Amino acid sequence: MKNSLIMVLLFVLQKGNSQELFVVTDPASNVPANSLGVNIMQSTFKEKFESGYNYHFMPEVTYGINKNIMARGTAFISNRSNQLVTEGGSFLVKYRFFSADDLNSHFRMAAYGRYSFNNSDIHQEQIEILGHNSGFETGIIATKLINKLAISSSISFEKAMDNKPNYPFPDAIGDNATNYTLSFGKLMYPKKYTSFKQTNINLMIEFVGQTINENGKSFLDVVPAVQFIFNSQARLDLAYRKQLLSSMFRTAPNGFYLNLYYTFFNLKK
């Protein structure tokens, strides 16, 4: 009986949330309570001003403390020094403070905070505490699911600090920014659910932007993606990030993401 209830839960989760598991942004929904998500995030970006590629390997674990609160830890590993080096990590907590459910739709809102530490060199004006800068970020996310379409948007404040011990933040560039995102996800397959074991195929497009508060310099990127979900537990993401416009100095704005994600449900029995 207990196993049957778990099966039903997985089916409901797949049917309701699969198309709002975005690649480069977080939705307002959380990892299910008492569940652990393991994500192997990889990105390869073309260097703009020199030959070669910037590779980042960022494993992360996410735990659902309860239905409204989740916590996440991420490690930062890159080839910035021409070899794979561990550069730091981050901790995130997200709190879902609003939820409204209907038969074929739901609306969620959440607030989050992230703190990161990083020892790599500071080499661009863009502030990115997920893999490049030490600092913190806090923001709000709103996500709407209507049938097979998910729409999510966020706004956040991000503050960069010194990359200790060797790289103080440069005085000549702004150290805080406003971030904004808009994401769309559409379930393309299956057309009709018959089992939680069905493979899901989602198409997504995400817009990611930032404005440095001190000087107004900005960028806007687009991220088209395809996503496969297997057996309601395993996920494969493939995405390409392309700079649409920018007035700030960025060393590697264009590149690919490959994410491998697995969720362990019902850890405490």
Where are these regions (language model features)?
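Bacterial Sec-dependent N-terminal signal peptides
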Residues: 1-22
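Extended low-complexity, intrinsically disordered segments associated with secretion/export
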Residues: 166-168
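Transmembrane beta-barrel domains of Gram-negative outer membranes and organellar outer membranes
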Residues: 18-162, 171-269
